[in-house]
Amino acid sequence: DQSFTNPERVGIALSESGAQGDWRLFFLTRDRVRDVTLAEVQRVADQYLVSSNRTLGTYLPTDAPVRAPAPAKVDLAKTMQDFKPQAAAAKVEAFVATPENLDARTQTFAVGGLKAAVLPKGTRGAAVRATLTLRFGDEKSLFGSGEVPGAVAALLDKGTRTLTREQVQDRLDKLKTELSIGSAPGRVTVTLATRRDYLPDAIALVGDLLRNPVFPEAALAEFKQQAITAIAQQRKEPDAVADNTLDRWGNPYPRGDVRYASTFDETVQDVNAVTVDKLRDFHARFYGAAKGEFAAVGDLDPAAVRTALQSAFGDWNRGAPYVRVPHPRVDVQPERVLLETPDKQNATLL
């Protein structure tokens, strides 16, 4: 009742109730608090104040506690009197990214089956970003591959014939390069964020990762554990359950087809079926630079990039012949589907 003496508090309370669905909830809550009984309070306490729903802290006194020292006082004026900032960053060109300017600046060339496009332009810190995509296989040759293609891509940076997993990461750090690898049916994509001077060496490292992976047993075990843990979590999430159901709804393809949408249980089975021998066999059969694309934008030397690509992929003209997997339109009958996700208060509508 005291809140009614403060118009600001009343306004905020009514606004919050309105956001929950009805501004009158504020008054309903007031009436429910007024009418609550001791028995109801006890019932709720017994229901919710259980050991699995609480965090317990224990105070353990000690005669000589070890405490971190207090922060030292700093004389800011004295600290700053000798400060000399770094030289201002060099100005870069004001490149206007119109279609005409992009076409005029872009240089294209081919390295074997690899089509390349580079756009040299000034950037802060000589930054450059690059993407490499290799394409392979078709719906028949990829049939039954399960989770093997994804596992191959996930383990590419876990060691090569000449570099351990730690050495790969050390090399990336030395080259000031961020690298990520992703995959989809019939392709693997590598993205790079680096600097002008390091781009050729980063391309050479990517070539080593793609051509000479060793697929360590420990890395495969780690991949399986992470994948199965993620699936176990998805089983409980409304959005993941809804997405999986929608993907499977009206899907006409048999299990094993790359367009088939697996259940959570089927995905776990496919993950468990992955072996190092299967990874090596898939890599030997499908990977190669016979079909692919490379693109780079930023502060770069086109001639140096071309030389690096030629050295890394010029003689790797192999891999299963690529044919794009068709995705024809599929007529799906409309239907309303309700799915239960126990212990989850949120919901997802698709």
Language-model region placement:
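Solvent-exposed, non-transmembrane alpha-helical starts
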Residues: A68, S141-S145, P200-A202, E217-A219, ...
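M16 family metallopeptidases and their MPP-like homologs
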Residues: D1-D35, T55-Y59, A117-N212, K224-A232, ...
